[in-house]
Structure formats: C-alpha cells, structure tokens
C-alpha cells in the first residue's frame, strides 16, 4: 500500500511543461532566446525564420495575424528583455494582448546571456512600464506594477534561468487566476 502512495505522490508532484509564447526583439536577442529554448525546460513557440519575418513585416495585419495565431492556446507569455525590447512595438502589442486575454505574463532579463559574437549586452528598460491596463479594477496602472520581472545572476545567468524559469512561469499563470 505504501508503494502505491509513493507512486501517487510522485504523480502529484510531476511538473508539466507549459506551452508558452516568447516575446522578444528578434534582431538583437534571437541567439539569447535560442539558448533558453534549448534548455528544454518549457515548450515554446518556434521562431519565425528571418525570411518569413521579412514577408510578414510588409503588412502590419500579417504580423498581427501571426502573433494572434501563435499566441492562442499558450498559457503564458514570457517576455525576454534585452537592451531594446521595451522600444519594440510588436513586443508591446504582445504584452497588451497577453494581459487582455488573461494569460500569465512574466519578464526575464536576458542581457547577461552570452551572444556568440557580441557577448553580453547592457540591460534594457522594463517593457511593462510602457503598457497601461485598459479596463477592469487595475485600469490605468502600468503593468510593471502587476507583472514580475526577473534579473538572473550576472555570474551565471544561463543556469539561474534554467533552474527557475518553470517556477517563474507557474507563478505568472497563478497570478492571473
């Protein structure tokens, strides 16, 4: 009987891989984002290829449609914050959409992940400072007062993210319930 309890206990504590949507500045941070995808801790959307992105960018409606389609069925949006992420209009759209849709939303600074050719970069601004809640009891508040951003250890950003990203995502999802 004890063996069954232990098996049941193990099943109860098994973590599931969440389906997430990554939001980031493609040109500057795609290599850093790829490091996070390769950790294998969570299941994320596949990035659009540079050629496909160039086609999509020709019309705002094409980009919006791609974002809306790829964000559907995701439980959380993970904003990977680099030097210029907070200035990117499509990142701000993704943040606003995630909040309006009731998805988990979390920010992780990635400036200390090493890019193969350029190394680390400087930290960017918090993109949640640039998005204001449009309705509900939090109307008028900046999302930076409602959404957690994590700044991994400078000395070992990769392993800090790998060890904690699952918990950060779970906390973001729980905060929206």
Residue positions per predicted region:
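A short acidic (Asp/Glu
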Residues: 33-34, 89-92, 117-119
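Short C-terminal domain-edge/linker segments immediately following a structured domain
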Residues: 51-56, 78, 107-113, 136-142
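Conserved beta-strand-loop-alpha-helix hinge of the TIR/SEFIR fold
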Residues: 71-99, 103-114
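Glycine-rich, charge-decorated loop segments at or immediately adjacent to ligand/cofactor-binding or catalytic sites
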Residues: 113-134
């Amino acid at each position: 009987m004890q063996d069954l309890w232990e098996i049941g206990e193990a099943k109860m504590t098994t973590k599931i891989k969440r389906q997430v949507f990554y939001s980031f500045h493609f040109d500057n941070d795609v290599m850093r984002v790829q490091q996070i995808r390769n950790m294998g801790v969570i299941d994320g959307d596949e990035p659009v290829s540079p050629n496909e992105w160039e086609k999509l960018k020709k019309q705002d409606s094409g980009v919006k449609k791609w974002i809306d389609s790829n964000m559907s069925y995701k439980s959380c949006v993970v904003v990977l914050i680099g030097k210029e992420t907070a200035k990117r209009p499509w990142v701000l759209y993704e943040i606003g959409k995630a909040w309006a849709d009731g998805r988990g939303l979390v920010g992780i600074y990635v400036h200390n992940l090493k890019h193969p050719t350029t190394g680390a970069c400087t930290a960017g601004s918090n993109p949640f400072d640039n998005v204001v809640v449009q309705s509900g009891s939090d109307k008028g508040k900046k999302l930076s007062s409602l959404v957690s951003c994590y700044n991994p250890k400078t000395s070992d950003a990769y392993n800090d993210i790998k060890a904690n990203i699952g918990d950060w995502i779970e906390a973001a999802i729980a905060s929206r319930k």
